[in-house]
């Protein structure tokens, strides 16, 4: 009997060993649950790869790991992501962005009126909920959920193209401050895009998972999330694999767009000093914005960057002599000058000009100049950091780990400001643009039971928690 049991045990062991060895050579199963970071300025999608334990962030058709959270409506079609961004200056009244600021949120009339003044598109109050007015062949209203659904549908299709199979399940992240209504509205947007949301995870928790802190021996974790339009600071307490958001603070009007605007205003002054005139064509203003963004990114790794952009200026207003060969009549221009005067259009053309001058505007921007232009904005980052420490009854020396999230935390001076405040370097081991989507994808893998199994992050609800905003 004992001999039979030994033989049986050996056979079972052999089968298990054979299965394990065979598993090494079999193709890994395709992940079926995606992780989504639906950000205010950019959004992205990723998957947890069974077997390797790695996360794959899925790129769009042009190789971008994230897409702008922008939807533009025209008479011909609806353009999402980078296609929508291309229309932001030529079709501003029908190009919707920052929809995440409005989703599921109830506004007073005064609050919504104040928010609306910041945007070129029209926002209407529907019993406290925001709706966007769009005019193409006809005028109609779209909800923030509808805008979110368009973005999520784009991400869903990107994942399907990459994985070669239909996708219907996802895990999604939301700001820790989102209440039940905002979370349900985000889920509704996903449902409209054909996605069943299996779990909603807070963005700071997702970021902590991306940094592997759900498996690390740390207790107090500070997450600084600085993106294109918002700053969020969260203090997390970690106990085992459980996360409790202990305090939140931030600035909903501070981000990379504000840093860009400071540089744009500087260039506005430079152009006026050099030529006495400013560009008025929407297409060229859009190119100038793109050049500013490129310079900002360049300055994260270089001490200086050259901005070079071709502009068309009204000849009548020029104060600088230019060769006659550069003067072009307005009949050769494909687009009429904009008549609108504001910082977005950088121009004031009271009448259609007869002649225009094509100039190549070129200037070198140093990192030192960029830091000087934004010095006060960079220092504002410390205000919510100090607030969460105060609310969490913590000394800054008691923070075990500082993690950075969001593309704007790439800026060297921002990292220095945070490092000088805490007296130690923040953790920058994860791409800040992809930290949240990486964490959400890990959580999607856990929900799907993917091997190798990770330690799941369990969030402890803190219903009494409120975010302190410094706008």
Predicted segments, located by residue:
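Short, basic/glycine-rich phosphate-binding loops at helix/coil junctions
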Residues: 127-129
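Conserved beta-strand-loop-beta-strand element in the redox core of flavoprotein oxidoreductases
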Residues: 132-134
């Amino acid at each position: 009997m004992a001999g039979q049991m030994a033989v049986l045990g050996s056979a079972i062991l052999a089968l298990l060993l054979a299965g394990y060895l065979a598993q090494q050579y079999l193709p890994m199963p395709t992940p079926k649950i995606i992780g989504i970071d639906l950000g205010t300025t950019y959004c992205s999608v990723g998957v947890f790869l069974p077997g390797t334990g790695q996360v794959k962030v899925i790129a769009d058709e042009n190789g971008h790991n994230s897409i702008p959270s922008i939807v533009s409506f025209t008479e011909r079609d609806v353009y999402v992501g980078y296609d929508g961004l291309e229309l932001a200056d030529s079709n501003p009244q029908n190009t919707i962005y920052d929809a995440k600021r409005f989703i599921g949120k109830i506004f007073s009339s005064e609050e919504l009126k104040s928010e609306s003044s910041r945007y070129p598109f029209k926002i209407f109050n529907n019993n406290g909920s925001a709706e966007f007015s769009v005019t193409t062949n006809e005028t109609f209203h779209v909800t923030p959920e509808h805008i979110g659904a368009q973005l999520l549908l784009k991400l869903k299709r990107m994942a399907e193209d990459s994985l070669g199979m239909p996708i219907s399940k996802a895990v999604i992240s939301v700001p820790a401050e989102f209440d039940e209504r905002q979370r349900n509205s985000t889920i509704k947007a996903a449902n409209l895009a054909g996605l069943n949301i299996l779990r909603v995870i807070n963005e700071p928790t997702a970021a902590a998972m991306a940094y592997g802190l759900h498996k690390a021996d740390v207790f107090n974790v500070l997450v600084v999330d600085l993106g294109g339009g918002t700053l969020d600071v969260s203090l997390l307490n970690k106990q085992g694999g459980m996360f409790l958001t202990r305090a939140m603070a931030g600035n909903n009007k501070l981000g990379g767009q504000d840093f860009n605007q400071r540089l744009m205003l500087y260039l506005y002054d430079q152009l006026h000093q050099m030529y006495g005139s400013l560009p008025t064509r929407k297409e060229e203003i859009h190119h100038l914005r793109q050049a500013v963004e490129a310079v900002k990114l360049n300055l994260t790794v270089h001490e200086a960057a050259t901005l070079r952009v071709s502009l068309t200026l009204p000849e009548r207003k020029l104060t600088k002599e230019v060769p006659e060969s550069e003067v072009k009549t307005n009949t050769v221009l494909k687009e009429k000058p904009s008549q609108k005067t504001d910082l977005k259009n950088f121009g004031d053309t009271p009448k259609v000009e007869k002649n225009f001058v094509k100039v190549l505007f070129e200037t070198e921007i140093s990192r030192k100049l960029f830091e000087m232009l934004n010095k006060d904005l960079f220092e504002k980052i410390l205000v919510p950091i100090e607030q969460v420490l105060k609310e969490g009854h913590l000394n800054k020396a008691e923070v075990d780990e500082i993690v950075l999230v969001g593309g704007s935390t790439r800026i060297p001076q921002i990292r220095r400001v945070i490092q000088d405040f805490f007296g130690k370097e923040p953790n920058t081991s994860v791409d800040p643009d992809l930290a949240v989507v990486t964490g959400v994808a890990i959580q999607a893998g856990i929900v799907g039971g993917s091997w190798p199994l990770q330690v799941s992050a369990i969030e402890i609800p803190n219903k009494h928690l409120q975010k302190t905003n410094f706008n």
